[in-house]
């Protein structure tokens, strides 16, 4: 349903809408090629994010010191970057994974929605995402 809405919104752009839809989805309708492209992009996005993090770490840790937080002109009082910020980053990542593990392994349904267990009816739009009546012309 979301892909259909995106397709309809993109196709409403004058002159270039159809070209944008075909570029994004591979066609106007949501079919197997669309789903393959969607899954491929969502598979690649975490790796892109990890690459950006590594580029950030290389750029930040490659310098001699911090960004001079005290505003001192000389290098004598500058803080070394690696011992403080790397440890802080590692502690933060460790705490994040502990909290994530608690939710995943001990409370898997804590952040879920009870409607996830309702059998789906493909012929009916779920009530939670039915658009307001005044938006219907844009989705048609």
Curated annotation (Swiss-Prot):
The chain crosses the membrane at residues 38-58, 85-105. It is found in: Mitochondrion inner membrane. It comes from the Eukaryota. InterPro entries: Cyt_b/b6_C, Cyt_b/b6_C_sf, Cyt_b/b6_N, Cytb/b6-like_sf, Di-haem_cyt_TM. Binds 2 heme b groups non-covalently. GO terms for biological process: mitochondrial electron transport, ubiquinol to cytochrome c. Heme b b566 binds at residue 56. This is Cytochrome b. It comes from Aspergillus terreus. The gene is cob.
């Amino acid at each position: 349903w979301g892909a259909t809405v995106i397709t309809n919104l993109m196709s409403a752009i004058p002159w270039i809408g159809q070209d944008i839809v075909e570029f994004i989805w591979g066609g106007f309708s949501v079919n197997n090629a669309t789903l393959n492209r969607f899954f491929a992009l969502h598979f690649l996005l975490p790796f892109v994010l990890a690459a950006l993090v590594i580029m950030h770490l290389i750029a930040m840790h490659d310098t001699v010191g911090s960004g001079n937080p005290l505003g001192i002109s000389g290098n004598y009082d500058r803080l070394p970057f690696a011992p403080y910020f790397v440890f802080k980053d590692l502690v933060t990542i460790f705490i994040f994974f502990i909290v994530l593990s608690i939710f995943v392994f001990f409370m898997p349904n804590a952040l879920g929605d009870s409607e996830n267990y309702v059998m789906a009816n493909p012929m009916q739009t779920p009530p939670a995402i039915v658009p307001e009546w005044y938006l219907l012309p844009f989705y048609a």
